[in-house]
Amino acid sequence: FGNVSAQVFMPIVPALIVGGLILSIKNLLVNYCGLSTDSGTAQVLLAIFSASFSFLPVYLGYQLAAVMKMQPIMGALLGAIMISSSISGAEGLDFLGIPIPTNDYSSTVVPIVLGVVFMYFVDRGLQKIIPDVTKLFLKPLLTMFIVVPVELIILGPAGSMMGYALSDAVTWLMDNVAFIATPILA
């Protein structure tokens, strides 16, 4: 688990560092150098920060799919679908009459991880049954047709709840037993 986590997250760390540092620079320029938050410069710096974190499901989807020996673009596509304006935060959606819970998946980790792991099993199953002559288009098509609804209806909402619970647990540990939690989390 630790090795896979490192393979997935380490290539993404530079983007997260850049995003955080750019936000710090923007805030310094706004607070101490008179840069207007409405200026083009501030907006560009904010866009760099936002892209670094908001598109996290895309980056994670790509990396995890690559580590799991799938086509990385399929993991990125699943992440992009999850954060698309048509899905993320949209209310009243359904798929074939099954309601899709409203969630904002930007900057999330657990939902895309669950989705790509599920995609792995679907991909492997389809690999065995789809004829080679049609694999190039039929396998990705069927994979997404199966994975996306399951991700949006079941795995994404469950992953969001798990992410919130994990965040709450870490916050509770840090607030109540920081002397124990800090070495464990470090």
Question: Which residue stretches match the model-derived regions?
Answer:
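Signature of multi-pass transmembrane helix bundles
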Residues: F1-L185
